[in-house]
């Protein structure tokens, strides 16, 4: 095959890859989230949000898969709130919980404010993270492509926006697994300044490759 034909072949493959990215819904969600994180970074440099001051309640946004009648997800967040209240005290906290359907979480998460997060979550996170002092990502399956990339993109978005504005950015008890290349790059790009407290050693090892700072080692029985 001539050099010209090889170059044409490579160009055609590149064009096909770009076209695939353009029509891949997961990729579009990731690209738009990444763009808003970069926009938040620029906004913060030009007009930083007021930082936390001693004596103020710490305003934390808890982002997870809440409001779908997924008992495990709801119980996780309920337990996190209990722990935070125990450690910090109610008078030192102002917690907000993202919920997909407020009607399904009515009566949950005592002392926390519930915020409806739309299915197209990008702008909501862009606006809401700015009004808090930090983000706690609560989803157990935090960085995985097993079912769909959208939920993991939401976790990256919440953490990445907080990190871009020099806020608290913590993934609490998260798990990482097999990720599509585009999701892995998104995690690598936007979660390098976040602290992810992994659920197990396997997740720590996976997150170490894209350079996400590890939290304390998970405890093992015995």
Question: Where are the predicted features?
Answer:
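Active-site-proximal region of nucleotide-activated glycan assembly enzymes
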Residues: 162-218
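Aromatic- and Gly/Pro-rich donor/ligand-binding loops
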Residues: 3-179, 189, 220-222
